[in-house]
């Protein structure tokens, strides 16, 4: 079972996968109090969006910096040290042992939680085979989850399809953050391992990352409210 002390609104993380800072700020204003947690990934970060993390934290929001760090240990450590000053709640690294160890050690006294990305939700067994892996998705996710927990990583980024299995492996304390969330009737897009918000929560997800179903909705605020309501209903709140 996922940790129970997270407000329903904060279980929804809206991915600000937008082209520039101005557009992202406008979306945050439009969503208002309906959203309390935002993700800043490659697109916005590389368009000058990292300062938005500080602004959001200053406004009482939570921030997930999703840069999926992966390099030699020293380089990862220096990156984590720099990014920890943004005040973010979450920071992602790829789930390779040296990368995870460096990130956990470099975090120091900051409050940022290190999340390990197991296998991207756009990958399936065939994609892994094409990349030279001898494991399928399920086995690779499980192996990386066990390594992450042993190293002291705070949580995992995984497909909602793996959430129930992983919850049984890592127990109730680790955060499970699941992209690949699509409300009923929404297009899958480039995601291959997807699930509705209610089913993901029931499977043991702690947080749901949602981008296009909110950002591209005719009324993004209403779309976010509907997802939070679905989360609350799934939890019996």
From Swiss-Prot:
Broadest EC class?
Answer: lyase
Q: Describe the reaction catalysed, as an equation.
A: orotidine 5'-phosphate + H(+) = UMP + CO2
**Biological process according to GO:** 'de novo' pyrimidine nucleobase biosynthetic process; 'de novo' UMP biosynthetic process
Q: Which InterPro entries match?
A: Aldolase_TIM, OMPdecase, OMPdecase_AS, OMPdecase_bac, OMPdeCOase_dom, RibuloseP-bd_barrel
Q: What is its EC number?
A: 4.1.1.23
Cite the annotated pathway: Pyrimidine metabolism; UMP biosynthesis via de novo pathway; UMP from orotate: step 2/2
- Which CDD domains does the UniProt record give? OMP_decarboxylase_like
Q: Does the keyword Lyase apply?
A: yes
Per UniProt, the keywords (alphabetical) are: Decarboxylase, Lyase, Pyrimidine biosynthesis
As one GO molecular function, the record gives:
orotidine-5'-phosphate decarboxylase activity
Family recorded in the similarity comment: Belongs to the OMP decarboxylase family. Type 1 subfamily.
Describe the protein's quaternary organization and the partners it interacts with. Homodimer.
The name on file for this protein is Orotidine 5'-phosphate decarboxylase
Organism equals: Rhodopseudomonas palustris (strain TIE-1)
Q: Where is the organism placed in the taxonomic lineage, from the top? A: Bacteria, Pseudomonadati, Pseudomonadota, Alphaproteobacteria, Hyphomicrobiales
């Amino acid at each position: 079972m996922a940790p129970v002390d997270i407000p329903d609104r904060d279980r929804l993380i809206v991915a600000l996968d937008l082209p520039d800072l101005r557009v992202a700020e406008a979306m945050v204003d439009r969503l208002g109090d309906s959203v309390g947690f935002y993700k800043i990934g490659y697109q916005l970060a590389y368009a000058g969006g990292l300062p938005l993390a500080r602004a959001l934290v200053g406004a009482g929001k939570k921030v997930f910096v999703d840069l999926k760090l992966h390099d030699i240990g020293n380089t990862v450590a220096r990156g984590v040290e720099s990014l920890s000053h943004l005040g973010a709640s979450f920071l992602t690294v790829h789930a390779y042992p040296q990368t995870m160890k460096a990130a956990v050690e470099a975090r120091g006294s900051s409050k940022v939680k290190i999340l390990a990305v197991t296998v991207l939700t756009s990958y399936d067994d065939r994609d892994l085979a094409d990349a030279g892996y001898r494991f399928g998705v399920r086995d690779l996710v499980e192996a990386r989850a066990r390594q992450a927990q042993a190293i002291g990583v705070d949580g995992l980024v995984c497909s909602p399809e793996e959430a129930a299995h992983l919850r049984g492996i890592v127990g109730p304390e680790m955060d499970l953050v699941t992209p690949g969330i699509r409300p009923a009737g929404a297009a899958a897009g480039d995601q291959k391992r997807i699930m509705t918000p209610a089913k993901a929560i029931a499977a043991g997800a702690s947080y749901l990352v949602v981008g296009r179903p909110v950002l591209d909705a005719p009324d993004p605020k209403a779309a976010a409210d509907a997802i939070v309501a679905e989360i609350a209903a799934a939890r019996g709140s």
